[in-house]
Amino acid sequence: MTDKTLEYRIHTKNPEPLTVIIEPWAEEVVLSPGSSLSLNILYDKEDLMEVETNPNYYVVWLWGGCRVKLAMNGEDLTRPFLLTPSP
């Protein structure tokens, strides 16, 4: 099986920190003003990604079977459980 990769980037210019939540793992990352977060989504079957926003948070819902690698401003934040396929 060969994984496909989708890169999704979130940039914040808010004057306040922005909380980004990656579901279904409930992984929270707090972005300081001017920061960016890269999500490298690994998958073999494409499906729907959903996003919910408000001024204080940004929620990204990924689809079943995918995995994700995170990097904030180029620094790897990937924790091992994020590389386990989502339910």
Q: Each predicted region: which residue ranges?
A:
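Charged, amphipathic alpha-helical segments
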Residues: 1-5, 45, 53-55
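Short, structured beta-strand/loop micro-motifs enriched in basic residues and often containing a Trp
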Residues: 15-23
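Intrinsically disordered, low-complexity Pro/Gly/Ser/Thr-rich segments with frequent PxxP/GP/PP motifs
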Residues: 23-44
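A cross-taxa feature marking solvent-exposed loop/turn segments within ectodomains of secreted
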Residues: 15, 44-46
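Glycine- and charge-enriched low-complexity intrinsically disordered segments
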Residues: 48-87
